[in-house]
Amino acid sequence: MIRFLILAGYFELGMYLQLSGKLDRYINSHYSYLAYISMALSFILALVQLTIWMKRLKMHSHLSGKAAKFFSPIILAIPVFIGLLVPTVPLDSTTVSAKGYHFPLAAGSTTSGTSSDGTRVQYLKPDTSLYFTKSAYQKEMRATLKKYKGSGKLQITTQNYMEVMEIIYLFPDEFKNRQIEYVGFIYNDPKDKNSQFLFRFGIIHCIADSGVYGLLTTGGQTHYQNNTWVTVSGKLAIEYNQNLKQTLPVLHISQSSQTMQPKNPYVYRVF
């Protein structure tokens, strides 16, 4: 009976995350089919366990000892309780500060690329090179650059946010003096009051490889508070940042306006 309840709990957890829209805060929305597969398997296995319990069938068990029989169901049930009871809070600039984010320094620095809790994080530029061979990655990025190369206004949307940010950092000269417009939340640079980052939290595959991506902005007439969602438009320049000790693409804002937070504040990498 306990096995049936645990498996039914996994099915209900999947339903809850899907119907509440919270599943998108854990995995790339393009992988939601995996959640449906998991729900279907949990439901089928739950029915199997219910049948075994009702017919009182004797099944072979590899568990030996009272401690193993006691703790194994508890361990399996923990994710269900966490998923159902722990509130899901969207990541924002408070998270950026609380996790002790330090933006990447120039090559050769001693910064390890991990946050204060020991997890690997990505900053500013999405990096999908880990998922390709070197030649395949270069080919993929060149093909992506070809899609957005030009002199007209570049509109960065929720759908293309991750791939556009990646090629802007890889090929900044191709976008120099280009008019760019996009939406993000404000994160004030603690070391420079005149500079603000405009970010979105992005997920490549799941929350474990998530990062905060966007551009350093300057020149805006209005100084916004942290977590303010803003639509900005301006020209991209390439400048050396003294604090980060590297050359970065910087958006010189010509227009900005406060906007509502999107229903889903996250962006996802589409492959």
UniProtKB/Swiss-Prot annotation:
Subcellular location: Cell membrane
Biological process terms in GO annotation: amino acid transport
Source species, domain of life: Bacteria
Topology in membrane: Multi-pass membrane protein
Membership in a protein family: Belongs to the UPF0703 family.
Free-text function comment from the UniProt entry: Could be part of a two-component membrane permease system responsible for amino acid transport under low pH. Involved in acidogenesis, biofilm formation and low-pH survival.
Subunit (UniProt): Interacts with SMU_747c.
Protein name: Putative two-component membrane permease complex subunit SMU_746c
Organism: Streptococcus mutans serotype c (strain ATCC 700610 / UA159)
